[in-house]
């Protein structure tokens, strides 16, 4: 069996066990387990210790591995850093390219729109040029026709000669030939060339048969007559030419030529087109300005409408909140202390109402029907009141309560006359309201038996004794047990008997702590002893 005192267990562990001695440890553990499970004759062999050289080699190998791992890590980190820097550069370059692309796209869009506009303008100019060419050709044709007509009329006038001296046997007439040259390209006005100015080209002779027979006889006479006729025709032609030139000059002075008229018309048409273009451009700019102004006005109107709607919604919300608050106040104002099972009443009043006292009517106070119209009302605002407000008003309550118990035998009109606050007795009576009096209280107390000088006949104690161990007046001489920290001592509003206000006649109760006002409780106890 293996024992703890055996030399195998007492041998020290070699330092190589941290690096390479794990096999020996495992062998020892396995041998221990097998010895425990198998027969007791099993023996564990000695642990083989590695040599120092092997240990050094292992250490060197480990160092090299660590160094190579550190190098690989550093290289990986550098590679990752380089990749990140390249990625950042690429992102910057892509952003710049996006910006450039946007700029180029905007410029290309502008150029395309400009080209389209120029193409449209070119088309319109071509159409205008074609239209003007057609007009120009029509005007030239009309001018040529008019000149030809004038020339024909002048030639007809010049072709009618005057021959006063003519023979009966032979009649000869010569007419000059007119040459009309129309230079369409260089000149628009025709040129008149009379051949008779230089030399006669054509001599039209009308010869009768009689003249042919008598040629030899009348040869000299014919020659003389021909010469005379030629001279007369030349004179007539010269006169006609002079008259025509003077008439043309007068016409040119009086009215311009049709060519000038056509040029003036073209200039006027161009001016008209320029003016129309200017007017259209001005209208376009005005339309753009008006559209922008209309858009701004519409936006302003929309904003004003939205603001008005928001204001109306706010007013509606405020009015709804006010109406809800008024509705709640009206609902709370309809609640009285004569109905103890209402959930909206304070807890201390419901406890007092259910456990402490039962109200009853008393002499000298108002009737139950009148009290029913003047129930004590707690608005929601009266339950939230600071202690400073109570400090400010508790002296007035004490003074008024003392004055009332000194003058308790007076009637309701004298006790409520003026602006005096009612006493604690009237408070407790108003708390009852004469509506929820129990039959026991109505049977025990009556108006004939009760008197203001005996507080025991009241049928319920004042609210000061809420939470006390005694039954109210019987324990007035002893100290009060301060079990409850809140009592129903009231702070009342001043009101008039003239009924100037409808809702201000009802007194308001405020919660008061007994721990804050011990002196006030003592004063009230003294008042109850009267």
UniProtKB/Swiss-Prot annotation:
Molecular functions (GO terms): DNA-binding transcription factor activity, RNA polymerase II-specific; RNA polymerase II cis-regulatory region sequence-specific DNA binding
A Pfam cross-reference name: bZIP_1
Region of interest called Disordered, as start-end residue ranges on this chain: 1-76, 142-177, 216-258, 389-481
InterPro entries cross-referenced by the UniProt entry: ATF_bZIP_TF, bZIP, bZIP_sf
Biased composition (Low complexity): 1-17, 24-39, 149-176, 220-247, 436-478
UniProt feature, compositional bias: Polar residues: 248-257
Cystine residue pairs: none
Cell compartment(s), UniProt: Nucleus
Coiled-coil regions listed: none
Location of region: Leucine-zipper: 83-104
A biological process from GO: endoplasmic reticulum unfolded protein response
SUPFAM superfamilies given in the database record: Leucine zipper domain (SSF57959)
One GO location term (cellular component): nucleus
Positions of the UniProt region annotated as Basic motif: 56-77
Role noted for this protein: Probable transcriptional regulator.
Protein name: Probable basic-leucine zipper transcription factor L
Gene that this polypeptide is encoded by: bzpL
